[in-house]
Amino acid sequence: MIEALLAARPGRAALIIVLSVLLTAPAWRDATAEEYPSRTISLVVAYPAGGGVDTVGRVIAQKLSEALGQQVVVVNRPGGGSVIGTRDVAKAQPDGYTLLLMVTGAALPANPGYDIDKDFSAIGLVASVPVVIMSNPSLPAKSLAEVIALAKKEGAKLTVGTPPSPTLNYFAAEQFKAMTGTDITIVTYKGTGPLTNDLVGGHVMLAFNTLPPAIGNIQSGALRAIAVGSPSRVAALPDVPTIAESGLPELEIVQYYGLVAPAATPQPIVERLNAELRKILTSEDVKKRLMDAGGDAMPSTPAEYARNIQHEEGKWHAVIKKLGLVVN
């Protein structure tokens, strides 16, 4: 029939076919979105297992699995700060089956092999997690003022552990040195899990560490929280002052975790994932689990998360430039 139409009246037949395709295309797109997901989804965590990002990632993966009816599996791809895992997701197929739990600071490495503004589609914020200045309990300083006084006295003999450059923790430690005029020695670790273990063991005496991998040790007394980097105190540690309260109001250190997908991921899939993520983050169960881990749930729209990425990455780029730090 189509061949006959084309032979008889090619212009009209072509128009009919084109109109038919245009009219049915939305239905195809809707069907694709409705069928998603039809197989396992990989949630890439660009940090080692056992660390703070991994802890939050596993909470979200479990709940997304339940909501979507397909397994969401955490895949740890650490290396280069967060460069390796982040770059892998940037180059993945934009089909909704490879996601990334992105953390503030992903745009800070030099020449990472991806563009934070062009290579990702923001899905939504997940949580805010403060960086905490914490110590081995044998350190004689119990407040931030005492830590600063001790740092001025001990100088390079006082060691402070952080994850590697280019992470927020590392740059915050450098900012702390500059603001306080101290010369403490920064020791970098592959992740927050190994850092926490060495801090408990007394191999390093002070740390700029995220809360999730250390909160149990803080609550048991194996570690001491000196000050939290969030604007206000955290519910999990209500007696621990903020860094601002402790005398350094310009030193705010908060990591924002969020879900992103490769750029060009179909908008219906992004919207589906955002809708499920927001439901998850408003559930009392997840809010409590994140709070117990030292974070706060932060449901958002994709646009709100995109603005957060731009603001936070810009803020830390300015810190790096001001301090004259070299980023590898």
Where are these regions (language model features)?
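Conserved hydrophobic/amphipathic secondary-structure segments
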Residues: 34-257
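An extracytoplasmic/periplasmic, membrane-proximal ligand-sensing/linker region
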Residues: 38-40, 179, 242-245, 267-328
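A short small-residue
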Residues: 253-261, 291-298
